[in-house]
Structure formats: C-alpha cells, structure tokens
C-alpha cells in the first residue's frame, strides 16, 4: 500500500470509519500519483487549454480538435515507462493498446500512432535489449490492429539506462456528431463491460508506476505489467465503433490504469451520479479471484459502455458478432457513492469524489542554479566532426526502427517517416501534419528554455510541412516529485511550454505525467515529450529534400552563439553543460508565420523544400536535405545572419531556435525575398554531387555512409 498516514487520516475523516481491505485497495489505486496527479495538478492548471479550433481540452481520455466542418481529431499521448523497463515487449505493446482505447473512447477510429522513445547508450547490452524489444512490441501491436505508426523519435543517453521512456501518441478521426465522452449522465443506465476477460495481471500497476524502480523491480514488479492481446484489441476496436454507430451511447471509457475502480468512479463522478457494480457478473479469466483482485485488475482490451437497458441486447449481439465477451456489470444510481456488491452483500461503499478527485499536494520546490558559463572547446576539423556527428545514433537514420512499422495501412499517409513530420490525408482538400519532439539536454540545462524549445521545435516541424499548428499534447517524464529540485524543474518546464503554446495559439489539449523515473539515485534527464497537430491544405505540403539544381537556398532566422547543450557538444566533446539555446518568442512566431504565409501564397510551387534547423544545427539539416534529394549544394558560410562573429564549428552546429531552410526556384527568388520581413539570407545554391560547407566538401556517398546503417550495426 502507498497511502500515506495523512491520506489515511483524511479518508477516514470523510468516511467516519475505518476502510475495509477492498476499499483501501481501491483508494490506494486512486490516490496514486499515476491516477490522481496529486503532485502535478496545481502546476498543470497553468497550461493554455482553449482555442478557436479546440472542441475539448484536458480532462477526458483524449482532446478533440476541429479539422473540417465534418470531422474532428481525437488526440492523446501516454507513457508506459515502468512496465517497459521490466518487460519491454509487453510493456510497449500494452502502452499502444492503452492509447488506442483512449481514442476509441471518444468515438474515434485511430488513424495514426507516433512514438517518442529513450534508452541508454547502445554500447550497453541491457539498453540494446530494451530498445530491440520495445520497438518489436510497438511494431507487433500496431501492425496487428491495423493502425499505422507514422512518425516518432529516438534518443540514447546514459540517464535512461535503467529507466527507458516509452511515450506514445495516437490520433483518431471522428465525425463531430458522433463524439462521445466519459460520462454516465442518466440514472438507470447500465454498465456494459466488453472485450477481454478479467485476470490477475496488472494489479497495482498504477502504484508500481508511482514509485521509483529498484534493482529488484524486474522480478518483484513483473506481475504489475499487463498482458497485451492485439488480436482481441482489433475485435474490440471494430465492435466498439459498431456499437457507437448503431446505439445511442450515453458514455464510454476504457479500462486502463486502476481498472474497474478508476473507470466506473470517473464515469459517474463526471456526471455527479453514483454506481452499483455486481462482481458476480464480471467475466473472469481465472478461478478464485478475490473482489480485491477483480476491482484492481488492469487486464487489457476492456471497455465499459454506458447504455440504456433497452439497448443491451443489440450491443451484446454486436459483441457476439465480433467474438468478444460482454456482460452487464452494474448500473448508474442516484447519489454520489460507488457501491460494490457480490451476491447481494455490499463489499465497498465509497464517495465517488473521494475516488475520482483526491486532494492535490502542495509540495516544496527548490530552484536549481542554471549554468550560464561559456563552454570553450577545441574544435576538430569540420571534415571529421560532421561525419562523426552523422554517425551518432541520436542523429543517424532511424530506418531500423520505422522499417519495422507499417506506416501505410489505411492508405492516408502522404508523407512517410523520415521527414520533419508525417502528413495524413483527411479529405480531398485537407491534410494533417503530426510530429513528436523533445530535447532532454536543453531541458536539463534550462528547464524553461528546454520546455519552450520542445514545443517550438515540434511547431517548426509541422510548419515546415506547410501546416498551421492547432494543438499540443505531451508526456511529461521526470524523476521523483518529492524531491524539491525535480518539482521545480517540472514547474519551469511547463512555464516554458506554455509560453510557446499560447503565442502560437496551439493549446495543450491532452497529456500525461510520468514521475518517479529514477532508480536508486540515477535520475533521467527531464523529458517533456511534445506532440503537435497541424492542419493544412493539401496543396501546401512541402518536404525537406532538395529538388532542383539551380534552386537558391535561403536561411530564415538569426544564428546565435548557442552550441552549448548541442548534439555537437554531447557527441564530439562529451559535454553536457552550459547555457541551453534561448527562446526568443517574438522571432519564433514571426519566422513561423512567414513560412506559412509564403507557402499559402505559393500557388506556382516556387518554394521547393522546407526544413527546420534543430538537432545538429545547420550542418546536419543541410546534410539531411542533400541525402534525401540525392543532390548536392554549395553554402557560403559568410552570408549567414549571425548575432556576432562565430567560429566555423560554432556557426554550423549552433542549435538556435526559430530557423528554417527553404529552397526557391532561381527565377522567383526576388519575388519571394520581397515578401519576407524577417531576417533572411541567400546562403547557397542546390548543385552538383557534394555538400560544400565553406571550404569543407563531402560527397553524397560519404554522408550516406556515415548516416545510414548505424543503428543496424549496433543491433546486428
């Protein structure tokens, strides 16, 4: 049990009595950090959550964004970190299953998955094992349920050796008049439990996720990891959507963390009603299960529909058709209590508000002094450093990962993995751009600028594809919130994220907090993994690859002396200190709006490529454009707009925010330049078969040999 003495006293003060074993187990689950957000809730409330395109912000299983007159997107992001550290294949698979159920719970059909993954160094055998089996778990689950995995990111850093991060984003499509919510508004409606049967797996999964891992966790906590079943999930998905299409459903919610306890209590509390649950009606996978085990089980692939009794027969016929189990397990009642019965005997009787709305905590915060010193290094020759940087697993091609994913099932994918963002078709005119991003070194060095930078980079990625950013989702991965310095990092990160989201009118509509990501004193780098959804006219889509010899290369934005905290410093110099790149929000906003305006007015397609500058700086961004297009370029480094005189390596590896590379048809350069009123310079031309950076030349083959096959060699 993880209930503290003060929480026990609070609970018993409200009840006016002692809890029995079942009640204590139910409340232990609901008071866990994972379910209650008791440490983070006061801080999360500072996020901007409303906007003109937002139908629903945080509070339900997913957020909702309007994309056309007819359609909305359901968008969510979840973590499955602790389970994946213990059982990587199953932990990753059940993470996919959970976010898919969240999207289905809004009435939407899942159309895309994205993943944001972090592991220790690939020189470490345990990290390789976790990486291999997490990717396998995501691949097997996503491919078998028929939902494409279209984008994502992977980082390798020693801070994640014992605490890998498995964050998954899902997007679903729903007609606006078919949206449902996680509510139980009508007394007399019944709870129809459908999907998989209830077993002993996952009991106390949420309390396990609300504690630090230890060296014994791999054996002691394995029973808390749920068992994935993608084949049942596919049937549950189709049956759920058919029920929603055929029946007037009052509400629906998936059974994830906290199992039936969490699902039922949140359904009725949202509608200020009560619930009665009859345990004897719940389909069980194992014999001899106790009420405690039944109510706390986190067995996968289960959903609860709130429906009128007259619709039960129709709903169960649909379940039978899809060969999944279903049963009426209770009803919505007057009052505000959740009552658990078994053969007429009341086993638990708890106020729903006590279960679904535990008190938040006002934990201590302690500021960490930021390192603002200038980090001086001896730069190796650019010929050496760029090829070495391209062969770093953090920069190198992630084809080993995404080739295992089916990214074209459902035939909506317009731009595939490997670009700034994935693009999916919604209808003949409308597409959406999707991306996930994080920069854990920046966030470690400066939580505010790191948090702001994560949102800004994700927004630049969708803008580079021609899409207007509509909304943000997140997974906020941190250490122990009981440590004042950790909670200060968390607060400052959210303040930075909020600054950018608010200025771009891209509210935070859904997300997840994962605390306690540390093992015996080893803490992860603070990791705000950010997903952004952008919407665009299909005609505005651009990609990063160089297209035509003779095109002029323009760099929009100013380059600052901001190489500290960069991939260059981490990879080439093994340094992770100094000042992180700062967010200059006015410039970030102006430059982003400039790109969108240029693309919107470019009916002749004179702008042929767009790419943002981020990890690895200008040198890596240009290398990617060369390799993608299989055509070289010549860059005049002296033409780049800078804040001051910079050494060559500081210039090409700076990770200053707010910068975009665009290529323009030579005949249209003057026309395009006349439309730009932010810092811009012609820095080169697309030509030949080499990348020429000042006096440094690289053949396309050299770049490809460094960039491709890196992860494959580690995993061979």
UniProtKB/Swiss-Prot annotation:
Q: Which domain of life does the protein's organism represent?
A: Archaea
Positions with a binding annotation for Mg(2+) 2: 102, 254
Location in or out of the cell: Cytoplasm
Q: Name one GO biological process term.
A: 'de novo' IMP biosynthetic process
Q: What does the entry list as the binding residues for substrate?
A: 79-82, 101, 226, 298-300, 514
| UniProt pathway | Purine metabolism; IMP biosynthesis via de novo pathway; 5-amino-1-(5-phospho-D-ribosyl)imidazole from N(2)-formyl-N(1)-(5-phospho-D-ribosyl)glycinamide: step 1/2
Q: Recall the GO molecular function terms of this protein's record.
A: ATP binding; magnesium ion binding; phosphoribosylformylglycinamidine synthase activity
UniProt: Mg(2+) 1 binding residues = 78, 512
Location (main, coarse): cytoplasm
> InterPro entries from the entry?
PRibForGlyAmidine_synth_PurL, PurL_linker, PurM-like_C_dom, PurM-like_C_sf, PurM-like_N, PurM-like_N_sf
Against NCBIfam families, the record matches this protein to: FGAM_synth_II, PRK01213.1
Q: What is this protein called?
A: Phosphoribosylformylglycinamidine synthase subunit PurL
């Amino acid at each position: 049990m993880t209930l503290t003495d003060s929480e026990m006293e609070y609970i018993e003060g409200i009840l006016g009595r002692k809890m029995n074993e079942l009640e204590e187990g139910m409340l232990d689950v609901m008071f866990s950090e994972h379910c209650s957000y008791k440490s983070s809730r006061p801080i999360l409330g500072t996020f901007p959550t409303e906007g003109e395109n937002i139908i629903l912000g945080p509070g339900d299983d997913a957020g909702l964004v309007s994309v056309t007159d007819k359609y909305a997107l359901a968008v969510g992001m979840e973590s499955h970190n602790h389970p994946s550290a213990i059982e990587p294949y199953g932990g990753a698979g059940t993470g996919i299953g959970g976010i898919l159920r969240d999207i289905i719970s809004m009435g939407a059909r899942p159309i895309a998955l994205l993943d944001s993954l972090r592991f220790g160094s690939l020189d470490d055998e345990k990290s390789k094992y976790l990486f291999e089996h997490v990717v396998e778990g995501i691949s097997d689950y996503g491919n078998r349920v028929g939902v494409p995995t279209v984008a994502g990111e992977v980082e390798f850093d020693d801070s994640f050796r014992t605490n890998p991060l498995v964050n998954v984003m899902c997007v679903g499509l729903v007609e606006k008049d078919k949206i449902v919510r996680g509510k139980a508004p009508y007394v007399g409606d019944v709870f129809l439990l459908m999907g998989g049967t209830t077993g002993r797996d996952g009991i106390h999964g949420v309390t396990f996720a609300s504690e630090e891992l230890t060296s014994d966790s791999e054996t002691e906590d394995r029973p808390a990891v749920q068992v994935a079943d993608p084949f049942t999930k596919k049937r549950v998905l189709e049956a759920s959507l058919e029920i929603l299409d055929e029946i007037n459903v009052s509400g629906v919610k998936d059974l994830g963390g906290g199992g039936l306890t969490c699902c039922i209590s949140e359904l009725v509390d949202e509608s200020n009603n009560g619930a009665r649950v009859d345990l004897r009606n719940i389909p069980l996978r194992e014999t001899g299960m106790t009420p405690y085990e039944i109510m706390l089980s986190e067995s996968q692939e289960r959903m609860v529909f709130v429906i009128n009794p007259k619709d039960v027969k129709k709903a169960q016929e649909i379940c039978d058709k899809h060969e999944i189990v279903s049963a009426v397990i209770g009803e919505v009642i007057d009052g505000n209590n959740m009552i658990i019965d078994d053969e007429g005997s009341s086993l638990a009787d708890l106020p729903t508000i006590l279960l679904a709305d535990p008190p938040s905590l006002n934990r201590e915060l302690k500021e960490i002094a930021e390192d603002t010193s200038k980090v001086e290094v001896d730069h190796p020759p650019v010929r050496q450093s760029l090829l070495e940087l391209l062969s770093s697993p953090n920069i190198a091609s992630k084809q080993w990962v995404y080739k295992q994913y089916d990214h074209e099932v459902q035939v909506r994918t317009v731009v595939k993995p490997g670009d700034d963002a994935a693009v999916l078709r919604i209808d003949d005119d409308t597409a959406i751009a999707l991306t996930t991003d994080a920069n854990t070194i920046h966030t470690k060095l400066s939580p505010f600028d790191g948090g702001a930078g994560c949102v800004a980079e994700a927004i630049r990625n969708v803008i580079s594809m021609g899409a207007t950013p509509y909304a943000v989702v997140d997974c906020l991965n941190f250490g122990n919130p009981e440590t004042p310095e950790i909670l200060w990092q968390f607060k400052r990160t959210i303040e930075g994220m909020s600054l950018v989201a608010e200025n771009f009118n891209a509210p935070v509509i859904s997300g997840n907090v994962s605390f306690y990501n540390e093992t015996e004193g080893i803490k992860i780098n603070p990791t705000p993994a950010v997903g952004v959804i952008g919407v665009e006219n299909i005609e505005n889509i651009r990609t990063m690859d160089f297209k035509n010899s003779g095109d002029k290369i323009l760099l929009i934005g100013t380059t600052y002396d901001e190489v500290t905290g960069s991939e260059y410093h981490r990879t080439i110099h093994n340094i992770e200190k100094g000042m992180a790149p700062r967010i200059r929000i006015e410039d970030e906003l102006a430059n982003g709006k400039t790109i969108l305006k240029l693309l919107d007015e470019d009916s002749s397609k004179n702008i042929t490529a767009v790419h943002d500058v981020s990890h690895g700086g200008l040198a890596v961004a240009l290398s990617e454009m060369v390799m993608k297009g299989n055509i070289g370029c010549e860059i005049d480094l002296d033409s780049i707009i800078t804040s001051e005189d910079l050494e060559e390596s500081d210039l090409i590896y700076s990770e200053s925010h707010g910068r975009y590379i665009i290529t323009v048809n030579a005949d249209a350069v003057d026309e395009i330049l006349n439309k730009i009123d932010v810092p811009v310079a012609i820095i080169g031309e697309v030509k030949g078969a080499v990348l020429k950076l000042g006096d440094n030349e690289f053949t396309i083959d050299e770049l490809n040999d460094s960039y491709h096959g890196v992860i494959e060699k580690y995993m061979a």
